[in-house]
Design a protein with these regions (language model features):
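Juxtamembrane/interfacial segments around transmembrane helices
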Residues: 90, 119-120, 140-152, 168-180
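Membrane-proximal helix-loop-helix units in multi-pass membrane proteins
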Residues: 62-135
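Membrane-interface capping segments at transmembrane-helix boundaries
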Residues: 79-81, 176-184
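N-terminal topogenic module of multi-pass integral membrane proteins
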Residues: 1-60
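Central hydrophobic cores of alpha-helical transmembrane segments
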Residues: 29-39, 137-150
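Hydrophobic, membrane-inserted alpha-helices
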Residues: 11-16, 120-129, 143-151
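Loop-to-transmembrane alpha-helix initiation sites
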Residues: 61, 116-118, 157-170
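Juxtamembrane "helix-exit" motif on the non-cytosolic side of transmembrane helices
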Residues: 42-52, 77-78, 102-111, 150-155
Length: 184
């Protein structure tokens, strides 16, 4: 279910900027935050009005999705601090998720919606297959979420419908395995 709210990806970017630049000057953090909000919310179309800019803040991306994306970014940054990763599948899952997230973020660029849709579809299929190689159960759940999002034509958002539940499970089990390795 899609929730129309003011929680968009820009709030995740705001948190990441303030987290990674916590030792920098406050003016730099505010300027980077303003740039990220504008870039992640402006839709570059034929004409851009103030009303269109304000309505772009109510994108149909659920707050739960934003929290999961933020949790995954923090998880992947934590994993990259302690190389090497466990397996090649972990590398591929992280790589394809970041590519899928990048194509979703770059959706405001003025190229064809069809090409953006196809890129998201390709990266989500690669993400599902790499997730299936890492964990068959999570891969099947992700493939079911992808197919259900393809069947629903209204408010199509691959990232939202694909990653809510599988990403939560993936981050939970990976974190659990890391905790078990640290304890034993």
């Amino acid at each position: 279910m899609f929730i129309y709210s003011s929680y968009t990806l820009s709030f995740a970017w705001l948190f990441l900027i303030f987290f990674f630049f916590k030792n920098k000057a406050l003016s730099l953090r505010f300027s980077l935050s303003l740039i990220s909000v504008i870039l992640s919310n402006i839709a570059l179309k034929g004409s851009l009005s103030l009303n269109a800019f304000l309505s772009s803040f109510t994108a149909p991306l659920s707050p739960f999705s934003c929290l999961l994306i933020l949790a995954y970014v923090i998880f992947s940054c934590h994993m990259l601090k302690k190389p090497p990763l466990e397996t090649l599948q972990s590398y591929s899952v992280m790589l394809f998720f970041h590519l899928l997230l990048l194509t979703d973020i770059l959706g405001f660029l003025p190229f064809s919606i069809y090409h953006h849709f196809m890129a998201s579809l390709i990266f989500s299929a690669l993400f599902c297959s790499s997730l299936f190689l890492s964990s068959p159960l999570l891969g099947v759940i992700a493939l079911m979420a992808l197919s259900s999002s393809l069947l629903m034509h209204s408010h199509f958002q691959i990232l939202d419908s694909l990653l809510d539940f599988p990403l939560l499970l993936f981050v939970f089990f990976k974190t659990l395995s890391l905790v078990q390795k640290r304890l034993y």
